[in-house]
Amino acid sequence: MMIQEELEATKQQFCIELDQVHSSKDLFDLKVRYLGKKGLFRCFADKLRECPSDQKALMGASINACKTYIEDLIRDKNNAILLAEESAEFLKEKIDITLPGEPQCPGGKHIVKKVLDDVVDIFVHLGFCVREAPNIESEENNFSLLNFEENHPARQMHDTFYLDAKTVLRTHTSNVQVRELSRGEPPIKVVAPGLCFRNEDISARSHVIFHQVEAFYVDRNVTLSDLTEMLTEFYHTFFERKIELRLRHSYFPFVEPGIEVDVSCECQAAGCSLCKHTGWLEVAGAGMIHPQVLRNSGVDPETYTGYAVGMGIERLAMLKHGISDIRLFCENDLRFLQQFS
């Protein structure tokens, strides 16, 4: 048999065998059998060496053409097999829409977020505008312009996170006061929610990061009575019950006079673990804005006065819901969080 006839017979036999191939493995085996180092085309290479010199070029071209033909068929078959395998895999993964669905647990607001939103909503209802200030603040805005002395303990690194010599993570949301008062003439009535950071030991009652709301009002003839009236209305709404307010003198650099704000406990002075058997719950620090803070902000304290109050959101959540450990808010324990969802 002439080489040309053998090549044609090889092509026909290959096509017959190729039609029986339906997997990548079988196709690989067929390719090795024909084109491998010990495959059928090896014998054509041997015959080419024995061929007369004047016929070698023609025979070589015929062998290469046959080999290319088989390689093209193998490539096309491989593509077809891959497509079929992908389609089969896709069908396996197809979703049966007739199957019953799996129940999904709906998400909900974190208890701290819920309380924060409630607090802000109450202040907005009382006529305050919502403003924000940055978490990263200059030492000047966080301390100096709020009347903190140079040697005040709060400025020390063991109480405050310093990013550099003049930049801190804010220790309170009071930094909004200077920013807002510097923008224009009173009246200004602002509530500012946000995160605060303090370099403290983490315990059941304190954390290095917490939420705070600052509310302040500056206008002509604002008095301590206005502050008391606002606080009474706020806490009555927040705790959803009638409350008594108790103001205790305290010291804060940015207010004068400064006061600690207590509200009557739900135990009605009978004494309980929540109020530590005192009948009162400490809820905020407040006071009349210090004249020097007004001056630092470009406001004339002879013409305008104002009050300010700052309250920790985690503390309010703990008091309202009887939570004993502030660390629970950060632990992502669903057994705890789902009680408030």
UniProtKB/Swiss-Prot annotation:
PROSITE patterns per UniProt: AA_TRNA_LIGASE_II (PS50862)
UniProt keyword Lipid metabolism present: no
Origin superkingdom: Bacteria
GO MF, any single term: ATP binding
Reported cofactor(s): Mg(2+)
Presence of keyword DNA repair: no
GO terms for biological process, alphabetical: phenylalanyl-tRNA aminoacylation
Alphabetized Pfam families for the sequence: Phe_tRNA-synt_N, tRNA-synt_2d
Residue numbers binding Mg(2+): 256
Catalytic activity: tRNA(Phe) + L-phenylalanine + ATP = L-phenylalanyl-tRNA(Phe) + AMP + diphosphate + H(+)
Binding partners and assembly: Tetramer of two alpha and two beta subunits.
NCBIfam families hit by this protein: pheS
Protein name, UniProt field: Phenylalanine--tRNA ligase alpha subunit
Organism encoding this protein: Chlamydia caviae (strain ATCC VR-813 / DSM 19441 / 03DC25 / GPIC) (Chlamydophila caviae)
Upper lineage: Bacteria, Pseudomonadati, Chlamydiota, Chlamydiia, Chlamydiales
Gene that this polypeptide is encoded by: pheS
